């Protein structure tokens, strides 16, 4: 497993989570919008109070701006955010089943010359470090990012890759879903847009939580 300061996976996969109900709108717009441009009809799965704080966080490098000017991705599936959804800790009161993982890579974004930054931990904490060159991916704690048990490394596991203003749909390489029923629903929505890029839709059960093995304060389950 890559270690902090030594190596990082190439391609460096990035994962955006969204609700199934948002997929049609994403396809109609041809991509993902940042929170500041989010349509009021979009199904929100986030913490409201954290989003209010993120709206004020300044990005000090690269294209700058604020966090809400960027489309957020994690460097791993099965994130702490998904656990919060799974255990109904966010403003969204559904479960993880309709949550999709939209997968791309940091290299694809860079090759498309789309402005981006990334962080070494959760982007909204005070002591976060921001970067805007891929060579600095080695500064991230990849052992924490890839950890199955992350109660003690929660902030570093939530390192973010942030794409400025708009993320084009054609850069999505895969859609990961929890089961075949959701897979069929995603395929049905994609079929309504025959002229658009159709990434493979794959059942990735290991990207989702199976059951709670501990209290919400532990937040580390298989």
From Swiss-Prot:
| Annotated region (NAD(+)-binding element), positions in chain | 38-56
Assigned keywords, A-Z: DNA-binding, Glycosyltransferase, Nucleotidyltransferase, Toxin-antitoxin system, Transferase
Query: Per the record, what is the consequence of mutating residue 122 to A?
Result: No longer toxic in E.coli, no longer ADP-ribosylates ssDNA. No ADP-ribosylation of gDNA in vivo
Report the EC code(s) recorded for this entry: 2.4.2.-
On the tree of life, the source organism's domain of life is: Bacteria
Query: One of this protein's Pfam families, by short name?
Result: DarT
User: What effect on the protein does mutating residue 122 to N have, as reported in its record?
Assistant: Still toxic in E.coli, decreased ADP-ribosylation
Q: Name one GO molecular function term.
A: DNA binding
Q: Per the database record, which ranges form the DarT domain?
A: 12-209
Q: Which residues does NAD(+) bind?
A: 16-18, 25, 33, 54
| InterPro entries named in the record | DarT
Q: Where is the active site?
A: 54 (proton acceptor), 160
Residue span of region ADP-ribosylating turn-turn loop: 119-160
Q: What is the effect of changing residue 68 to A?
A: Still toxic in E.coli, decreased ADP-ribosylation
Catalytic reaction equation(s): a thymidine in DNA + NAD(+) = an N-(ADP-alpha-D-ribosyl)-thymidine in DNA + nicotinamide + H(+)
**Outcome of residue 53 to A?**
Still toxic in E.coli, decreased DNA ADP-ribosylation activity
The outcome of changing residue 158 to A is: Still toxic in vivo, decreased DNA ADP-ribosylation activity
Instruction: Provide the top EC class.
Output: transferase
Listed result of changing residue 154 to W: No longer toxic in E.coli, no longer ADP-ribosylates ssDNA. No ADP-ribosylation of gDNA in vivo
This chain's function reads: Toxic component of the hybrid type II/IV toxin-antitoxin (TA) system DarTG, which plays a crucial role in controlling bacterial growth and bacteriophage infection. Its toxic effect is neutralized by cognate antitoxin DarG. In case of phage infection, DarT toxin ADP-ribosylates DNA, which inhibits both viral DNA and RNA synthesis and leads to abortive infection. ADP-ribosylates ssDNA on the second thymidine of the consensus sequence 5'-TNTC-3'; the protein does not auto-modify. Has no activity on dsDNA in vitro. This leads to a decrease in DNA replication.
Question: Could you give the domain comment from the record?
Answer: The NAD(+)-binding element stabilizes the ADP-ribosylating turn-turn (ARTT) loop which confers substrate specificity; both domains contribute to ssDNA-binding.
Quaternary structure and partners? Interacts with cognate antitoxin DarG (via C-terminus); this heterodimeric complex neutralizes the toxic effect of DarT by preventing ssDNA binding to DarT and consequently inactivating the toxin by direct protein-protein interactions.
Q: Which family does it belong to?
A: Belongs to the DarT ADP-ribosyltransferase family.
Recorded protein name is DNA ADP-ribosyl transferase
What's the name of its gene? darT
């Amino acid at each position: 497993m890559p270690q902090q300061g030594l190596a990082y996976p190439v391609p460096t996969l990035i994962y955006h989570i969204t609700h199934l109900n948002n997929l049609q709108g994403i396809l109609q717009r041809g991509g993902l919008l940042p929170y500041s441009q989010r349509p009021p009809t979009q199904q929100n799965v986030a913490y409201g109070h954290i989003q209010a704080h993120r709206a004020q966080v300044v990005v000090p490098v690269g294209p700058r701006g604020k966090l809400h000017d960027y489309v957020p991705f994690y460097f791993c599936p099965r994130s702490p955010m998904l656990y919060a959804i799974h255990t109904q800790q966010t403003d969204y009161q559904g479960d993880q089943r309709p949550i999709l993982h939209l997968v791309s890579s940091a290299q694809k974004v860079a090759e498309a010359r789309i402005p981006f930054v990334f962080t070494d931990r959760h982007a909204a904490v005070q002591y976060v470090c921001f970067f805007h060159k891929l060579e600095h991916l080695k500064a991230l704690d990849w052992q924490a990012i890839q950890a199955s048990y992350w109660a003690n490394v929660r902030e570093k596991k939530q390192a973010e890759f942030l794409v400025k203003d708009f993320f084009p749909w054609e850069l999505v390489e895969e859609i990961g879903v929890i089961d075949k029923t959701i897979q069929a629903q995603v395929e049905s929505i994609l079929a309504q847009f025959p002229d658009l890029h159709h990434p493979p839709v794959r059942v990735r059960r290991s990207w989702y939580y199976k059951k709670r093995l501990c209290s919400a304060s532990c937040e580390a389950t298989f």
